[in-house]
């Protein structure tokens, strides 16, 4: 069985709840519907949880873990984190051991989501552009060639 990061397509199912301070998602194999992974946001402390329900939510620091559940294991294979930010976000992506794989740096003053994808040394390697709704994203290389897409489709 392929590991979570070896898959080219994954379906994401959000854990639904009222007044959630932390987000969680199941990662599903599109062919079988089997749960192959879990994404869990870690929010520590009562004060931080309460801030998640205010206008500061979009500026707050976050730490998200991607767990590979394939084959009965529960292994953190990826983390995504961001410190508190005022204007331009820098999101760090690391492997399960904490080694930085790259970063996303937000473009300042943009109506639709736009970010540069940086390698561990901070060099721009790709560009991520979303539509105005933030549902569909396209990764392009330095020459403008499409490298991949992320699409959100409402299924409920």
Set out the residue ranges of the language-model regions:
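Intrinsically disordered, low-complexity proline/glycine-rich segments
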Residues: 1-156
């Amino acid at each position: 069985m392929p590991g979570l990061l070896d898959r080219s397509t994954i379906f994401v199912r959000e854990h639904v709840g009222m007044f959630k301070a932390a987000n969680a998602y199941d990662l599903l194999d599109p062919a079988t519907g089997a749960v192959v992974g879990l994404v869990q946001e870690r929010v520590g402390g009562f004060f931080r949880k309460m801030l998640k329900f205010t206008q500061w939510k979009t500026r707050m620091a976050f730490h998200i873990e991607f767990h590979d559940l394939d084959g009965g294991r529960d292994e953190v294979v990826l983390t995504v984190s961001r410190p508190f930010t005022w204007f331009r976000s820098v999101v760090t992506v690391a492997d399960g051991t904490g080694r930085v794989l790259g970063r996303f740096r937000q473009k300042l003053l943009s109506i639709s989501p736009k970010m540069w994808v940086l390698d561990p040394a901070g060099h721009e390697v790709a560009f991520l552009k979303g539509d105005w709704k933030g549902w569909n994203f396209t990764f392009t290389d330095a020459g403008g060639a499409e490298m991949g897409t992320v699409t959100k489709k409402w299924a409920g």
